[in-house]
């Protein structure tokens, strides 16, 4: 598959200044960054494409080569001469870190020296009942992760020894493959990007500085969370390499469906059945809330589907904004399993509502059938 033009990738013209290129990169990096698009392979590919375009177009030598030869300038065996590995030189990762670190708090520092890599972030999916989500709860969870080896204190080296600076890249973690008049930055094949090598590894972790362990954590879930909310536990992710800081643990909340209530924002919704007689004559019906049962006054001649708002009976949002309401929908139940006598009484009642009294006693039915009659009259006229 052919590569897209680097200028097109960043959405800038060929006469764009370095400032314009950095501005375009910053915007696209935020849009497609993997932390913002977890599980989206398409976004990850676009992020890599944007990063590659930025690294080429902000380096004067690489940009000049690209402007003259296009993508062929960076292909192996592209006619620009051979070369070997070499340490030192410009660290293009520092350029990337200057921009990218401003956005996400990362980036390398310190004259191109390679830092040990921070531990990976972890995600834990937590399922809650509606009651737990609304009121808040503390949950104990077990998380399989990598922790610092306590035998070598995370260094990976045996006690009494230490990691040494890599002789191939001189601690940079990257080397340059020279191709004619420019160089391409690559991960050091000796230390695999770490900048250091361990000649006498720890027997416990075999030089990794980390080992597998299941951690038990107590997670406090604040009141008002909902499905999709994420709780960050700083430093509870995987331990970093060679004593580097640990990543974070993100607890992803999912609230189970409730058998009575549905939640929308800070409001709760429920359906309450009422009898045919109560809907017609009025009365009181018991309504469930998260705080207990309350009585709702049903007006006379209530139609099925009518909504009632009970203020302050919803959810207090986790981000503030007050307490939501409980929206109650009354559903008029049709009587079933009627006796002969009950059927006769209903027939008598229905007959008493017919004739001239139909409009008075059945306003919706009368309006519906008048509408149907008008519809067919219009079709035949």
Swiss-Prot record:
Q: What is its main location?
A: cytoplasm
Q: Return the InterPro entries for the record.
A: DnaJ, DnaJ_C, DnaJ_domain, DnaJ_domain_CS, HSP40/DnaJ_pept-bd, HSP_DnaJ_Cys-rich_dom, HSP_DnaJ_Cys-rich_dom_sf, J_dom_sf
Q: Single Gene Ontology BP term?
A: DNA replication
Keyword entries, A-Z: Chaperone, Cytoplasm, DNA replication, Metal-binding, Repeat, Stress response, Zinc, Zinc-finger
Q: Does the keyword Chaperone apply?
A: yes
Q: How is the cofactor bound?
A: Binds 2 Zn(2+) ions per monomer.
Compartment(s) where it occurs, according to its Swiss-Prot or TrEMBL record: Cytoplasm
GO CC entries: cytoplasm
For this protein, the record's HAMAP family field holds: DnaJ
Q: Entry's PANTHER family?
A: CHAPERONE PROTEIN DNAJ, DNAJ HOMOLOG 1, MITOCHONDRIAL-RELATED
- Which protein, by its recorded name, is this? Chaperone protein DnaJ
Tell me what organism the protein belongs to: Vibrio campbellii (strain ATCC BAA-1116)
